[in-house]
UniProtKB/Swiss-Prot annotation:
UniProt name for this protein: Methionine--tRNA ligase
One term under GO cellular component: cytosol
Record's keyword annotation contains Transmembrane helix: no
Extent of motif 'HIGH' region: 11-21
Organism this protein belongs to: Methanopyrus kandleri (strain AV19 / DSM 6324 / JCM 9639 / NBRC 100938)
NCBIfam families per UniProt: metG, metG_C_term, PRK00133.1
Function: Is required not only for elongation of protein synthesis but also for the initiation of all mRNA translation through initiator tRNA(fMet) aminoacylation.
Subcellular location, principal: cytoplasm
Length: 668
């Protein structure tokens, strides 16, 4: 394998990091890069902060500060938050024009290449202008009523209620957020990136790139099918990267034009520091570029950014890993309401590895997940403390107490050798395919096996009855402990290091090869063992819950007779295709269905018999609610719900007279 360039979405410097940011983007990228490096692969992790655009300019204006002050403050806070969680970067920089002139140069280099190639076009546009403030009103400088859903408070670039991207002139009843007055429409010249010219190339790339996850591919292809529109890449603003074109001296690039170029800027800065050529990463077929992002910016990374790369002849992403949303105690996180867990607050109460563990195992990355303090306590205490920590501590404590603190010289049961090899192979395969939860679960299964092996062979009896066999059992357990330390290193770096040092090793587990997990443990003296993980107590939980307001405020002011658009948008309604159907044993009406919903196949139990025979359901496309609480019925776990009409159910059908609809497409 050649070089691997791992990037994480640039953190926007208008606030510190919360656990949702960590789960979707930074943690999986860190795990993946650590894994690659342990395998001896030439991999680097590039990241930083995104510092331009209207939100920062507006925040600075409202606070009476310079944008640079906002950027500098939150850049340092974000960097510290990432360090608190042991998330390591080979290069961590910023896009701020005042602090990083290299990024200005790189952004303008991209623009000039695209301009010279004919992909940039000048057009006259309408924009809102505030006569009171005597200024244009780009993006969030204006609010109003969404023209699509009627929600009040829609911003000039986006409606939070229905998720639509907007232009300021589309808003109904617009008002300037600075002075509150009604703006007027004026005309000005802007520059457009001709995204439409890349429509066919993007479609081919999306459909042929098997490395792209389904949640990314399906979402991006849906945009392509609806027709790509050319992209306005400048703003009438004084905060951003200047446009190097005559007549545009008072304008800057749109933040989503310059932000992804930050990946290239930071790579060049890394290469300049270590004496490499940045084009070996961005203009080489031997490099795999892996982007880790949140699902809210799929369109930017799967359409806009690849088109820009095509336009300059650069390497396209190998894959784009998009983490889904994280809720908090069943409610959408909200920084404005304080319904959020900040990284800094968490790490004051608990070790970083506890958060890393929970965010990985709570749900696959490609599914929405919920952070619950009660579930966090249960998983830490039952899985880390009672399973993994217990096995390591009881093994090493027994060796320390009864074998003079020396790992015994003995043979290892073949059963253990085989189990370690099998686990190592599965963990490797899962990580190669970005299945982080499944990989870490396999490691925990190995420690569970170790506990069962220890309990079954009763070394506390063998030490007196059969010392030779006792030595074999304990050496086998110590070998499992070593394998656990190595395979945990990408996931739980601090805990893996503790386990490694507990075996008497003086080097770092982060400096050993991934294959070291398969090697025998060394015969050496160990230090007195200490517990690896702290137990989460009720007192700890009370302190943690005190960080949140008593109520999330999610339903404040809502009429119980109505469902808000925000509530409706929490429903994950998709097109599903039934792959298998069979009667549920013991039930008169239930049919068990296996349904393809794009990024995964789910099981649903539905009362469709005798209206429908199982055979006639296979191949049908149906409407699926994909994020309903799972429920067990007649011994079958139902993970989704299909929608139908009436007590004698009539399935809703999908109109495909205009185009074919794919499993996984969202219903909105």
């Amino acid at each position: 394998m050649g070089k691997v360039l791992v990037t994480t979405a640039l953190a926007y410097t208008n606030g510190p990091l919360h656990i949702g940011h960590v789960r979707s983007t930074y943690l999986p990228a860190d795990v993946y890069t650590r894994f690659l490096k342990m395998r001896g692969i030439d991999a680097i992790h590039i990241g930083g902060t995104d510092n331009h655009g209207v939100p920062i300019a507006l925040q600075a204006e409202l606070e009476g500060k310079d944008p640079e002050e906002i950027v500098e403050k939150y850049h340092e806070m974000i960097k510290e938050d990432l360090e608190r969680l042991n998330i390591h970067f080979d290069e961590f920089s910023c896009t701020c024009r005042e602090f990083n002139p290299d990024h200005v140069d790189m952004t303008q280099w991209f623009f000039k290449r695209l301009y010279e190639a004919g992909y940039i076009e000048e057009r006259e546009v309408e924009q809102l202008y505030c006569p009171e403030c005597e200024r244009p009103l780009p993006d969030r400088y204006v609010e109003g009523v969404c023209p699509y859903c009627g929600a009040e408070g829609a911003r000039g670039d986006h409606c939070e209620a229905c998720g639509r991207y907007l232009e300021p002139v589309q808003l109904e009843e617009p008002r300037c957020v600075i002075c509150g007055s009604k703006p007027e429409v004026r005309r000005t010249m802007h520059l457009f990136f001709k995204l439409s010219e890349f429509e066919e190339d993007l479609k081919k790339w999306l459909e042929s790139n098997d490395n792209l996850p389904k949640n990314v591919r399906n979402y991006a292809i849906q945009w392509v099918r609806e027709g790509l529109k050319d992209w306005d890449i400048v703003r009438d603003l004084d905060w951003g990267v200047p446009v190097p074109l005559e007549g545009y001296e008072d304008k800057v690039f749109y933040v989503w034009f310059d932000a992804p170029i930050g990946y290239v800027t930071f790579t060049k800065q890394y290469c300049d520091r270590v004496g490499q050529d940045w084009k070996d990463y961005w203009f080489s077929e031997d490099t795999k570029i892996v982007h880790f992002i949140g699902k809210d910016i799929i369109v930017h990374h799967a359409l806009f950014w690849p088109a820009m790369l095509m336009g300059v002849g650069a390497t396209l992403p190998y894959t784009i890993v998009a983490g889904e949303y994280l809720t908090l105690e069943g409610e959408k996180m909200s920084t404005s309401r304080g319904w959020v867990v900040w990284v800094k607050d968490f790490t004051k109460l608990f070790p970083a590895d506890l958060l890393r563990y929970y965010l990985i195992v709570v749900s696959p990355l490609t599914r929405d997940a919920d952070f619950s303090w009660g579930d966090f306590r249960d998983r830490v205490n039952n899985e880390l403390v009672a399973n993994l920590g217990n096995f390591v501590y009881r093994t090493l404590s027994f060796i320390y107490r009864f074998l003079d603190g020396n790992v015994p010289e003995a043979e290892t049961d073949q059963e253990i050798v085989d189990k370690i090899k099998e686990t190592h192979q599965r963990v490797t395969e899962h990580l190669e395919k970005f299945r982080f939860r499944e990989a870490l679960t396999e490691v925990l299964r190995l420690s569970k096996f170790g506990n069962e092996y220890f309990q079954e062979h009763e070394p506390w009896k063998l030490k007196d009855e059969d010392p030779e066999r006792c030595a074999e059992v304990l050496r086998g357990c110590a070998r499992i402990v070593k394998a656990l330390a190595v395979m945990l290193a990408p996931f739980l770096p601090d805990s893996a290091e503790k386990i490694w040092q507990s075996l008497g090793y003086e080097d770092s587990v982060h400096d050993v090869d991934w294959e070291e997990a398969l090697e025998d443990v060394e015969t050496k003296e160990i230090p007195e063992p200490e517990p690896i993980f702290p137990k989460v107590t009720e007192e700890d939980l009370e302190k943690a819950k005190a960080l949140l307001p008593e109520e999330s405020g999610e339903s404040e002011g809502q009429d119980d007779e109505y469902v808000s658009l925000e509530e409706f948008n929490r429903l994950d309604l998709r097109v599903g295709k039934i792959k298998e159907a069979e009667r549920v044993e013991g039930s008169d009406r239930l049919i068990k269905l296996r349904i393809d919903i794009g990024d995964r196949t789910v099981t649903a139990v539905a009362g469709l018999y005798p209206t429908y025979e199982p055979e006639e359901l296979v191949g049908r496309k149906v409407v699926v609610l994909a994020n309903i609480q799972p429920k067990e019925m007649f011994g079958v776990r139902s993970e989704a719900m299909i929608l139908a009409v009436g007590d004698e159910p009539a399935l809703l059908t999908i109109d495909e007279s205009k185009r074919e609809v794919e499993p996984g497409e969202r219903i909105r």
